[in-house]
C-alpha cells in the first residue's frame, strides 16, 4: 500500500536563517486535524476499530462476502491510521526538538503496532483458505477485485509466512523496530553541536545539515575545505555512536531475514516488490563498468574549475560564476512553466497545492532537513517538506518533490485506497521526470551561454548524484548487510573503512582523479536513507526511465503523455 510513512522520519535538522516567512510559506497541517485534541479523538475511534478486526479471525474463508467485509475493515482502519501518522510525523518534522511532538509520534507508532498485531492473522489465514478458493472468491465477489494484487502477494510469499501464532509474535516486536532510525534522527537533528566557521569574506556559516549543503558550493576553495573539515569533523566525533546505532539496524534486519526464511536481507527487502536480486547486482556491475565515464566528468570539472588536483570538496560548486538567487515565488513559477507539457490539469493541480499550502518552504531551527513528500493521507492531500535555499538546486528540488506529490494526488484521485499506492521502484520516475522537464525549460529561456552552462552543469551533477552516487550507496548497503547476515560484527570505524574504500574507488582516488581525505569517509553516518534498507538503488534505476518519458513527451510522440499519465 502506501510507502511514505517512514520517509518523513528519516532526515535531519536545519538552522540556516531563512527569508522572512509568510503564512503561505508554511504548510497547513490543520487540513489533517485542526488540533491535537481532534487527533486524540480520532485515535480513540481508530483504536476501537482495530479491536473489531478480531471478529474476522477464523472467518476469512467463510464466503467471498465475508472476506471482502474483513478486508474492507482492515483497509478502512489502515487508511484512517495513515492520516493520523502523517499528522504526527509532520508535526515532529516542523520541530524535532519539541517533546510534545515526539510523544505524539510515539503514540502513533504504538497504535500502528497494535493495528499490525491485530491484522497479523490475515496472511496465514488467506494461505490456509488456499489459492483455488481465493480465485473462486475473486470471481464470485467483484468487490474483491481491488484486493487482487494484495491477495496475490500473500500467496506468492507463502514460503516466508509463519502460522498465525508465529505471525502474531513477529508483529508484537514491531513496536521495538526502527529505533536506530529514530536515534539517528534525534541525534543528527536536535543533539549534535554543529560547528560555526568564519568564511574568507568575514561572514559566519552555521554548518548544520542544510548549512553544509549550502556552503559546500561556495566559490572560495579554501572555504570549501573549511566547510568539509568542520562538518565531517563533527560527524567523526560521533563515529562510535553512529556505528552502534547503524549496526543495531543491520542486526535487526538480519533477524527478520532469518525469521522469514530468506537467504539474505537483500533478497527479503527486494521481494516486497517482487524484484529479483539480479536487478540490484546488475545495476552495481553496470555502474562499476562505467566508472571511467564518471572519472571523465570529474576531470572535465577540474579543468573548468581551474584546479590541478580535484578534491572531494570540489564536486559541488557551480561550473560558472553565473549563480544567482531564485526566490521561492520565482522558483514555483519556473516549475509551473516547466511542467506545462504534462497537461493543463496537471499544472492546475500543482498550482492549487501551492496556493492551498501543501508545502513547508524554508529551513528553521530543528526542522527536518532535506526534502520529502508525505502522501499517505489518502483522503486529504500530499504534504511537502522543503528547505529552500534560493538557489537553482532548490528549484530542482521542489520540481522533484512536487512530482511525487502529483503522482500521489492523481493516483489517489483515480483509484480506491487499496490500489492507490505505488512502489518506490516507479515513484522516482515521476520526480526525476519533472527535473528533466525543468532542465529543458531552463535551457530554452537561458539568456546566455554562461547561464546555459550553469544548468547543464547542474544536470551533470544530478546524473552523478542520482545514478552514480546512489549506486555507490547501494554497493555499500549490499556489502554491510551481507557481512552481518554472515554473522560478522561491525563498528563505526569498520563502517568508515568499508565506505571509504568504495568512495575512493568510485571517485578514482588511486588514479588521482578525485582525492578523498580519510576524514570524509565518515559520510556513511550522515546518509538517512541507509535506515531504509535497499531503498536508494531505486533512484538509479528510475532515472533512465524518467529521462525517456520526458524526452518522448517533449517530442510529442503519439501516446507518450497518455502512457506517462497512466503510470
List each model region and its residues.
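Gram-negative bacterial Sec-dependent N-terminal signal peptides
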Residues: 2-16
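A well-structured
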Residues: 17-322, 332, 503
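C-terminal, non-catalytic "cap/extension" segments appended to globular domains
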Residues: 19-21, 30-34, 122-130, 137, ...
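Long, K/E/R/D-enriched contiguous segments that form extended
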Residues: 300, 304-341, 407, 460-466, ...
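Catalytic zinc-binding patch centered on the HExxH motif and its immediate surroundings
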Residues: 324-326, 359-381
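Short pre-active-site segment immediately N-terminal to the catalytic Zn-binding motif
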Residues: 326, 379-399
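Post-HEXXH active-site segment of zinc metalloproteases
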Residues: 397, 408-432
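Post-HExxH zinc-binding segment in Zn-dependent metallohydrolases
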Residues: 422-450, 459-465, 542
Amino acid at each position: 500500500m502506501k510507502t511514505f510513512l517512514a520517509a518523513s522520519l528519516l532526515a535531519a535538522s536545519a538552522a540556516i536563517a531563512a527569508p522572512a516567512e509568510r503564512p503561505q510559506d508554511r504548510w497547513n497541517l490543520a487540513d489533517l486535524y485542526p488540533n491535537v485534541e481532534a487527533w486524540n479523538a480520532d485515535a480513540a475511534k481508530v483504536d476501537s476499530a482495530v479491536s473489531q478486526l478480531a471478529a474476522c479471525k477464523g472467518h476469512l474463508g467463510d464466503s467471498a462476502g465475508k472476506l471482502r467485509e474483513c478486508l474492507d475493515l482492515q483497509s478502512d482502519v489502515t487508511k484512517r491510521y495513515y492520516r493520523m501518522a502523517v499528522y504526527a510525523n509532520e508535526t515532529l518534522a516542523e520541530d524535532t526538538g519539541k517533546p510534545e511532538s515526539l510523544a505524539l509520534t510515539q503514540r502513533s507508532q504504538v497504535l500502528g503496532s497494535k493495528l499490525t498485531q491485530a491484522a497479523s492473522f490475515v496472511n496465514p489465514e488467506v494461505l490456509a483458505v488456499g489459492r483455488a478458493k481465493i480465485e473462486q472468491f475473486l470471481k464470485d465477489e467483484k468487490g474483491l477485485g481491488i484486493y487482487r494484487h494484495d491477495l496475490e502477494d500473500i500467496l506468492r510469499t507463502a514460503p516466508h509466512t509463519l502460522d498465525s501464532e508465529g505471525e502474531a509474535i513477529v508483529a508484537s516486536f514491531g513496536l521495538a523496530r526502527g529505533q536506530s532510525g529514530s536515534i539517528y534522527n534525534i541525534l543528527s537533528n536536535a543533539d549534535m553541536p554543529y560547528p560555526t566557521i568564519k568564511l574568507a569574506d568575514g561572514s559566519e556559516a552555521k554548518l548544520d545539515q542544510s548549512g553544509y549543503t549550502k556552503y559546500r558550493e561556495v566559490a572560495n576553495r579554501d572555504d570549501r575545505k573549511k566547510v568539509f573539515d568542520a562538518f565531517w569533523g563533527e560527524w567523526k566525533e560521533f563515529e562510535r555512536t553512529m556505528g552502534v546505532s547503524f549496526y543495531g539496524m543491520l542486526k535487526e534486519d538480519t533477524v527478520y531475514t532469518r525469521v522469514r526464511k530468506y537467504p539474505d536481507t537483500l533478497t527479503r527487502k527486494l521481494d516486497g516488490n517482487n524484484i529479483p536480486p539480479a536487478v540490484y547486482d546488475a545495476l552495481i556491475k553496470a555502474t562499476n563498468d562505467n566508472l571511467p565515464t564518471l572519472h571523465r566528468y570529474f576531470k572535465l570539472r577540474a579543468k573548468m574549475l581551474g584546479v590541478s588536483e580535484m578534491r572531494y570538496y570540489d564536486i559541488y560548486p557551480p561550473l560558472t560564476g553565473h549563480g544567482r538567487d531564485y526566490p521561492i515565488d520565482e522558483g514555483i513559477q519556473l516549475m509551473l512553466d516547466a511542467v506545462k507539457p504534462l497537461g493543463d490539469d496537471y499544472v492546475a493541480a500543482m498550482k492549487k497545492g501551492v496556493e492551498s499550502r501543501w508545502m513547508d518552504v524554508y529551513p528553521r531551527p530543528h526542522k527536518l532537513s532535506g526534502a520529502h513528500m508525505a502522501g499517505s493521507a489518502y483522503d486529504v492531500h500530499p504534504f511537502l517538506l522543503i528547505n529552500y535555499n534560493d538557489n537553482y538546486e532548490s528549484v530542482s528540488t521542489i520540481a522533484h518533490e512536487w512530482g511525487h506529490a502529483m503522482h500521489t494526488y492523481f493516483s489517489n484521485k483515480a483509484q480506491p485506497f487499496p490500489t492507490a499506492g505505488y512502489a518506490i521502484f516507479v515513484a522516482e520516475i515521476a520526480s526525476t521526470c519533472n527535473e528533466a522537464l525543468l532542465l529543458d525549460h531552463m535551457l530554452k529561456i537561458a539568456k546566455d551561454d554562461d547561464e546555459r552552462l550553469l544548468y547543464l552543469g547542474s544536470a551533470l551533477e544530478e546524473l552523478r548524484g542520482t545514478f552514480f552516487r546512489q549506486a555507490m550507496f547501494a554497493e555499500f548497503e549490499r556489502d554491510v548487510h551481507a557481512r552481518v547476515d554472515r554473522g560478522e560484527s561491525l563498528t563505526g570505524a569498520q563502517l568508515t573503512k568499508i565506505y571509504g574504500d568504495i568512495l575512493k574507488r568510485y571517485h578514482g582516488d588511486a588514479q588521482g582523479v578525485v582525492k578523498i581525505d580519510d576524514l570524509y569517509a565518515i559520510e556513511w553516518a550522515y546518509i538517512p536513507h541507509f535506515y531504509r534498507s535497499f531503498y536508494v538503488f531505486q533512484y538509479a534505476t528510475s532515472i533512465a526511465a524518467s529521462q525517456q518519458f520526458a524526452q518522448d513527451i517533449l517530442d510529442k510522440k503519439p501516446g507518450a503523455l497518455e502512457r506517462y499519465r497512466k503510470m
